[in-house]
Every structure is written in C-alpha cells, then in structure tokens.
C-alpha cells in the first residue's frame, strides 16, 4: 500500500497567504471553478479531448451540465488541500481518492506535464479573483500547494490494481 508520508515544508506565512486568499474566494467558488477550468482549455485547447463530457460536445462550455460540477470538485479539492497543507504536513486528500484520481488520470492519458497547465490556470484564476492580495509570495505559496497535490496524484498514476 502506497503511503504519502513525505512531510512538506510549507511556512506559516505561506499557509496564512493561502488561507486568507482561499477564504476571500470561497464565496465565489462556483464562478471561479468555471473560470479555472475555462483557463485550462484556453491554455491547452487539446485538453478538451481528455474529458468525455467535452470531447464531442457542441454545447457552449457554460451550458455543459457536467462541466460545472466537475470544475467545482477539482477547484474545491485543490484549494482545500492547499489550505490544509501546513497543518497536516501533507496532502489531505484521502488515499483511496488519490488512488482513484491517479488511476483515472492515467487511463485518460494525462501526463505529469499536463499539471503545469492546471497550475498556470489556477494561478491566473487566483490573480484575477483576489488582485488586492496578489503578490509573488502568494503566487509561490499557491504554486507549492498545487505542486504537492499534483505530485500526490502523479505518484498514483498507474493502472488500477
């Protein structure tokens, strides 16, 4: 059984920046999650092919019934994991969920480099959502948090056993 026992160096200041910005964004998380996902597709249009509910859809993104719930779950998981990183010292997504996420990403043909796109989309979304809080320090804190979650998923990207 794979365990994510790596303790993460995430400073108190980084945690405070992430928590403060996440608290400021939470109330708009439905709208922001859609923006986040739209940015992924803007940065990497071929990513649309990775999602069965988008692949052959002619429906505009904002009218796709499956996109918003998916975007919301990805955005919330990313942000909640980031906010818990220092307190827990590791990614707080349950191991069974990480295994499922890893297997699903593997099956869909996701490669580690794809997570750079999600990181850029996340940072762009946060920068637009809380411009008054945006700084190099905030960017770095969110980048570290994203990379920790991405690494945990990538570690589980293998065929289901």
From Swiss-Prot:
Domain Globin span(s) in chain numbering: 9-158
Species, as recorded: Lotus japonicus (Lotus corniculatus var. japonicus)
Induction comment from the UniProt entry of this chain: Induced by abscisic acid (ABA) but repressed by ethylene and cytokinins (CK, an equimolar mixture of kinetin and 6-benzyl-aminopurine) in roots. Slightly induced by sucrose in seedlings roots.
Annotated function: Phytoglobin that reduces nitrite to nitric oxide (NO) under anoxic conditions (e.g. during flooding or in waterlogged soil) and upon root nodulation. Required for general plant development and during nodulation, especially for the onset of symbiosis. Monitors nitric oxide (NO) levels during early phase of the nitrogen-fixing symbiosis and buffers oxygen in functioning nodules. Necessary for the production of pods. May not function as an oxygen storage or transport protein. Has an unusually high affinity for O(2) through a hexacoordinate heme iron because of a very low dissociation constant.
Name of the featured protein: Anaerobic nitrite reductase Glb1-2
Residues holding heme b: 52, 66, 70, 100, 104-105
Motif (Homodimerization): 42-46, 112-124
Enzyme class name: oxidoreductase
Disruption phenotype annotation: Normal vegetative growth but slightly delayed flowering and reduced pods number.
The EC number(s) this enzyme carries: 1.7.2.-
Note on how the cofactor is bound: Binds 1 heme group per subunit.
Subunit text: Homodimer.
Tissue spec: Mainly expressed in root nodules and leaves, and, to a lower extent, in roots, stems, flowers and fruits. Accumulates in mature root nodules.
Residue numbers marked as site, Homodimerization: 139
Keyword Lipid metabolism attributed: no
Keyword Iron: yes
Cofactor(s) in the UniProt record: heme b
GO biological process: one example: response to abscisic acid
Family designation: Belongs to the plant globin family.
């Amino acid at each position: 059984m794979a365990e994510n026992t790596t303790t993460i160096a995430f400073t108190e200041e980084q945690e405070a920046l992430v928590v403060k910005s996440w608290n400021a964004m939470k109330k708009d998380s439905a709208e922001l999650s859609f923006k986040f996902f739209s940015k992924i597709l803007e940065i990497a249009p071929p990513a649309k092919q990775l999602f069965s509910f988008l692949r052959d859809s002619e429906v505009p993104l904002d009218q796709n019934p499956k996109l918003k719930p998916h975007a919301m779950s990805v955005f919330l998981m990313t942000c909640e994991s980031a906010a818990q990183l220092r307190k827990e010292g590791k990614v707080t997504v349950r191991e069974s969920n990480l295994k499922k996420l890893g297997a699903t990403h593997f099956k869909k043909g996701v490669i580690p480099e794809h997570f750079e796109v999600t990181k850029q989309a996340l940072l762009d979304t946060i920068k637009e959502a809380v411009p008054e809080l945006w700084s190099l320090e905030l960017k770095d804190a969110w980048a570290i948090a994203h990379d920790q979650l991405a690494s945990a998923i990538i570690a589980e990207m293998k065929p289901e056993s």
